[in-house]
Amino acid sequence: VVSALSIHHLSDEQKRSLFERIYGALNDGGVFVNAEQFRCATPERHRFHHERWVTRVRELGAAEPDLAAALDRMKFDRAATLEDQLEWMRQAGFRDIDCAYKNLIFAVYCGLK
């Protein structure tokens, strides 16, 4: 199962439930991979990384109206910390859980059934 930039729209309880449902849907040895936005462990760190992301997006040439629209949409995000999400995967039964990539407020993590 592969997901990208979707699960952060769910409540924490819905995230936990979804991880359990994904685990149940996988065959033994199956893999769940999620590319996701996350909330940093502290508000200060999150603000710092979010500001760096905005700066980088501007450096890469994002149009200001597009960036403004993205920032407006982000107000409705319900991101959880990366640590919480990895723990919820463990609780659902996943093993060999790993964060394969992390940059600012984005990560790719995975686990095996």
Annotate each predicted stretch with a short phrase.
Residues 1-2, 89:
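Hydrophobic beta-strand segment of the Class I
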Residues 2-3, 33:
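A conserved beta-strand element that flanks and buttresses the S-adenosyl-L-methionine
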Residues 32-33, 96:
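A short hydrophobic/small-residue beta-strand
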Residues 86-113:
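Core SAM-dependent methyltransferase catalytic element
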Residues 35-92:
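C-terminal alpha-helical "lid/dimerization" subdomain adjacent to the S-adenosyl-L-methionine
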Residues 16-28:
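A short glycine-rich, Lys/Arg-flanked "PGG" loop and its adjoining helix->strand segment in the class I
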Residues 8-10:
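A short His-aromatic
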